[in-house]
């Protein structure tokens, strides 16, 4: 039986039982990614160079004994480097808010920054790295803003702005739309957006949820290439039953069980994801990254930038 039909029948049965016995049930919303064939969650056959643009949340995520992302990526055949505060030309490593991405990959990009990013092979955080550098440039670029970027003003369904960068839903959509112009010229690279983690405060939580759902479900609908992907780090941290993962042969984006605020904050007043949340994200992300990588490679990417 078709998996989607089976899931729907199961949900109807559970809902019916709830009605009969007077129970109030919350059923998950499960988005299933469109698939062009088999999905391959296996590690690359040969080491692949990867760089991660981040700040403190990413540093914790990479760290051994916390999120273990760096070590896990290495075990999956990725040679991992990273940027952090103070990194790079003009100290651009300090600037990783959504409004800053145009300086990296948008209309304000700088060739010196990009050359440094693609060539970087150092570790700017602490994590185990046992692989030898396979040479060449970084092929995969992960980039993430931190949790203050979940405080987006405006309304959940606001359309993209036409100009200007600020901390609103409209502006955030504009920024990511503008990035696609550059990404289309760099089909020789795989760019992976890591969504900003959630806040504990719920004031703008509905906006954060709507924006990240837009990134996962709508942003790339009309983008014709396979060199851009999204991992919903935000969603994985909003409830133990929320997932963005490879499950039962499908990529699932499971929402709607819990709320839109952080369930894995380090402490009251500190929204850095804790070790449990960071490890959950690692477990869900790495198989997806493998899928993104194989899908990109199967598309026959060019070896040089596209003019």
Give the ranges of each region predicted by the language model:
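N-terminal module-boundary/linker segments of secreted carbohydrate-active enzymes
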Residues: 31-81, 97, 290-302
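Active-site-proximal beta-strand/loop segments in catalytic clefts of secreted hydrolases
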Residues: 53-56, 83-88, 143-148, 194-199, ...
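A solvent-exposed, charged loop/short amphipathic helix patch at secondary-structure junctions
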Residues: 152-171, 255-267
């Amino acid at each position: 039986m078709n998996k989607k039909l089976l899931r729907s029948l199961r949900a109807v049965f559970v809902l019916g039982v709830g009605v009969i016995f007077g129970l109030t049930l919350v059923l998950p919303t499960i988005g299933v990614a469109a698939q062009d064939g088999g999905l391959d969650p296996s590690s690359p056959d040969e080491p692949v160079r990867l760089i991660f643009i981040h700040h403190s949340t990413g540093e914790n995520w990479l760290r051994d004994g916390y999120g273990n992302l760096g070590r896990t990526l290495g075990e999956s055949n990725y040679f991992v480097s990273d940027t952090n505060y103070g990194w790079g030309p003009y100290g651009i490593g300090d600037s990783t808010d959504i409004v800053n991405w145009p300086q990296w990959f948008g209309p304000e990009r700088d060739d010196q920054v990009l050359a440094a990013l693609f060539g970087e092979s150092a570790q700017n955080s602490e994590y185990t790295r046992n692989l030898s550098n396979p040479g060449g440039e970084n092929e995969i670029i992960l980039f993430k803003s931190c949790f203050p970027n979940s405080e987006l003003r405006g309304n959940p369904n606001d359309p993209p702005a036409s100009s200007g960068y600020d901390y609103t839903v409209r502006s955030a959509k504009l920024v990511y739309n503008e990035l696609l112009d550059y990404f289309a010229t760099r089909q020789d690279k795989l760019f992976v957006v890591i969504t900003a983690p959630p806040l504990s405060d719920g004031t703008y939580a509905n906006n954060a949820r709507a924006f990240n759902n837009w990134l996962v479900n709508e942003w790339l609908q009309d983008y014709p290439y396979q060199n851009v992907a999204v991992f919903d780090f935000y969603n994985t941290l909003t409830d133990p039953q929320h997932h963005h993962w490879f499950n039962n042969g499908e990529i699932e984006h499971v929402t709607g069980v819990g709320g839109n605020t952080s369930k894995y904050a380090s402490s009251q007043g500190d929204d850095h994801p804790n070790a449990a949340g960071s490890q959950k994200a690692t477990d869900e992300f790495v198989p997806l990254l493998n899928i993104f990588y194989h899908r990109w490679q199967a598309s026959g990417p060019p070896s040089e930038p596209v003019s």
